[in-house]
Amino acid sequence: MAPRASSPALSENEFDIFDALAGGDEAAQPMRVTADLGIDLEFGSDDGSDDEAFIAAKQAAANRKNANAPGKSGKKGGGFQAMGLNVALLKAIAQKGFKIPTPIQRKAVPLILQGDDVVGMARTGSGKTAAFVIPMIERLKTHSAKVGARGVIMSPSRELALQTLKVVKEFGRGTDLRTILLVGGDSLEEQFNSMTTNPDIIIATPGRFLHLKVEMGLDLSSVQYIVFDEADRLFEMGFAAQLAEILYALPTSRQTLLFSATLPKSLVEFARAGLQEPKLIRLDAESKISPDLKSAYFTIKSGDRDGALIHLLENVIKMPVGQTEVWKQAKEEADNLSKGKKRKRGSGNPKDAPVEESTIIFAATKHRVEYLSTLLKAAGYPVSYVYGNLDQTARQEQVKDFRAGLTRILVVTDVAARGYRHATHKPRHQLRLPFSTKNLCSSSGEDGPRWAEGLGIQPVQTCRSAISHRLTNVPWQTPSGCLAPYQLEPSVELVNKQLTDDEDLVNLLNVAEKGERQYQRTRNQASNQSVHRAKDLASDSKFAETHMLFNDEMHDALRAKEDMLERIQGFRPAETVFEIGKRGTNSEAAEIMRKRRVAVERQKTKQAFNKANDESSGLTRPTADALPDDELDSEDDQQAAVGDYESESDELEVTVSQPESKKSGKDVWRSDEFFMSYLPKENFAEEKAYGVQGGDAGNSNFVSAARSAEMSLVNDEIQGFADASKPRMRWDKKSKKYVSRANDEDGSKGAKMIRGESGQKIAASFRSGRFDDWRKANKVKMQRVGEMEAPNRSTQFNSGGPRYKHKAEKAPKQADRYRDDYHVQKQRVQEAKEKRIGHFKDGGAKNELKDVDTVRKERRVQEKRKEKNARPSKKRKF
């Protein structure tokens, strides 16, 4: 028999020969085997098997059909079918509308299915909820008859928990898994009842879940799968003690997952303590600035910063002054509705229309946000603002106005904007350069892939300018320079006039400057290498030239004027004030300056000589491109391991570049054709991040991976600036000893606290005895974990959805003065009248409305009285 033909390498579909064997329609058709099948059809003998040729032909036809399918590209990516999910779950995923997994799902789902602990960094809207819900349903599969919850999902807020519950129900549509919701604000008795129905999945907030655990004495030894969703928000909201207590009660064999938008230091420490050999999932593409984002850097003076902002909005972004068209249309429709006019047909919803000039301005502190929003409103721009401790309702209203197009500008702090999904597809403007490259990538590149064309504008101060050289995917060829003074002066004068006329604006500016000084003292400082690069950059004459974006607008006369002003600004007199007019005299001050000048000249000569020797020997100062990993002395320096300007394959990057000036004696030993750098190219890191097989090879060491991904943001208000230098202990007069200041912050000061199983302090009110009273009143017996489920408990299951209650309101009976509780009952009746309950709904007064019969009867009585009393009156005698 002839040897078997090799299987087609490009095949992804299994071949079904049932129709051919059963004599179907396709079997009756003659076979047409073409010469170019893409496979090996040489069987070695003339009497080869017809079945093998038939299978090969059908397989080749299937390959051609898949290759020629419309909308398919040559590069094939694995879908949900390649992850080994069950049929019911795949059907639910298809009904949900998911076809291709997102990058975070492509990397996280296989690792979670393997049983590894995972720390995933993903922004809101990246599909992270499905990334941990799909493996959870695949692992739990069906409802277990044994008592005990097997999956727990922790959410920071009630709204996010409800959203997660909806996703779990949609993906678990084909299973009988029981899911309950435990959040604050709901009835404890109803949640007691839900916990006795043996749920498989618990979606809860940490505070309420810990309350039920302590109150009911829950045994969590059956938990196999726990997820901390939005883990950074959990720590920010003060749930660290609750999470530690919950984690201590879980078995060691559990699988723990953390998903977060950022990775603060506290979260890294929690992951190291609570997770076993975790794998960090972080796509390098999310730490890059989008190639669709055009960047421009402007050097400005501190005093001209606000004027430069007005100038950029007016002349670069071309933002009009006044209310938006969407706002005018919405106001017109509101006026028409108030006048009783109908809405015009086909006008559409004006709140759905985007604004072309949508701009986002990032600031450091909330005081700066308040000042900028007030300044821009005074300049005539519609502005929304968001900062950290803004009320949730006010924050939603501000963001809603910006998304609806009622405002053109959103002023926001870095803390409030973290993980926030921007709905705009137009440029965003950034007022200040952040303190780290990670923060800049998070703020500037968060929604880059969704932009048709973006514009990032960063006014740069000299001490922070070198940070941009360390950015991945942003070469140093990005243009930089100062603004044209003749265009900047009117905007600066406008800001000065506003400050002169508005006293409140001056007060806001003073508070903002004080807060910014506090921010400068508490933020992370730049490394020594960054300081050296900043000094080298500041000494470059091109750094102070007019930006190339404004060169076309400058005429020859204006350019000559600017050049003259630049020369005047850079003028250095040959003599100091101590030497003027004192030549030839024996002045002590002049003699000191002459000696000082000799020492300075000697030092300059030595530096120039050393620099010339370094260039002649091919040695230069270590920069971001040639610095070894062990010499990178800050978190910004550690990110330089992914190449900078050496990546030549990034052809899709959209930047406004300027030609480099060739410096003699620098990098002359490096050949573009033969030189091989030890640094990995940029596309290598991108392909490694998106890879499915072997994608976790670089994340085997969580400590080193988390060190590069860690990002702790400085608070945006003054109260949080001094936390780093705040004393950790205080003297307690009552106990006569030093105690931790955490006692003042966790609620234990002046309140009763108890120690949990993990040693953490929890509120004593968690153990109030309400569950024991409820259990006795309802005669419910709690089953132990591991026992078989009682058959009568399944009928009482509630998934945490709405429960229907009667809404009957009964008013109390009238008070009886002969009873002992007369005064108490009278008070209840009075309260019912005030609240209009029951038959007091229309008020407690007597109903004075008369019916027709009563009115008719009263009229007849009045007529009879008139007839009877119609006799003339007696005359009075005086």
UniProtKB/Swiss-Prot annotation:
UniProt-listed InterPro entries: DBP10_C (IPR012541), DDX54/DBP10_DEAD-box_helicase (IPR033517), DEAD/DEAH_box_helicase_dom (IPR011545), DEAD_box_RNA_helicase (IPR050079), Helicase_ATP-bd (IPR014001), Helicase_C-like (IPR001650), P-loop_NTPase (IPR027417), RNA-helicase_DEAD-box_CS (IPR000629)
Compartment(s) of residence: Nucleus, Nucleolus
Residue ranges annotated for the Helicase ATP-binding domain, each copy included: 109-281
Enzyme Commission number(s) of this protein: 3.6.4.13
Residues binding ATP: 122-129
Polar residues bias: start-end ranges: 521-531, 606-620
Molecular-function GO terms, alphabetical: ATP binding; ATP hydrolysis activity; RNA binding; RNA helicase activity
Transmembrane parts of this sequence: none
Recorded family membership: Belongs to the DEAD box helicase family. DDX54/DBP10 subfamily.
Name recorded for this polypeptide: ATP-dependent RNA helicase DBP10
